[in-house]
Amino acid sequence: MKPWSKTWTFYDGDWLEGNPPLAGPRSAAMWLATTVFDGARAFEGATPDIDRHVARVNRSAAAMGLKPVVGEDTWLGLVKDGLKRFDADKALYIKPMYWAEQSGVVPVAPDPDSTRWCLCLYELPMPPEEGLAITLSPFRKPTAETAPVDAKAGCLYPNNARAGVEAHARGFDNAIMLDVLGNVAELATSNVFMAKDGVVFTPAPNGMFLDGITRQRVVRLLRESGVEVVEKTLSYRDFLEADEIFSSGNAAKVHPVKRIDERALQPGPLYRRARKLYWEFAHG
């Protein structure tokens, strides 16, 4: 097993180093997946949209039947304190979390009064600006009738993970996932954009994928810079015929796609503008 990178977690009033055991085999979180989290980044001295990330984890908790017991200002203060435990030049992943310790009114439901929480920060380098090779996944996104898609919930990620693993087995880095209607939703690990004839397109949020904070920021920054951004229903064929494809998400922020199936792509001007605008925003 690979060693963990440098990690600090605030739990129950203390900062704990490493990967502390916070749940046991009877914990609802352990065997019933009653967890929500958010992911923010610290890099190059910036923590872009950290306020929106901590607000979202509280909304996710409520959507999952947990109690969002930590105020947003408290989260932000703890993030500031946690950052001091790392070298200033290190890129970090910032992960506020809630989970249920016990079951509730039915055995598989979380007991909101047993809500636990922590804030975990760990070193995670920003990935190099290398393009991704992507393909179409056979796995699809769930709907609000089948999964808690209105929360950033841990239970949603095994479906994304199997899409990623299946794509890797075929020699790709990531995969486009469709919704149940057969339209493009997102990549297995991030939101997705395409450009065609000078216009940027991205799937319109429809309740079947997370409308990411970085996605929203990229859309806004591009529009404010004068770029036309269209949110609409898109097919896989649209992406196969795109001039550019790029992704947005917490791990890499804005990242290019270099290949879709067997068709090679180059990082184009709209991707480069999106990335430049985001980095300027992050450091502004």
Predicted regions located by residue number:
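Helix-start/capping segments and mature chain N-termini
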Residues: 1-81, 99, 108-284
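Ordered, amphipathic secondary-structure segments that act as subunit-interaction surfaces
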Residues: 85-97
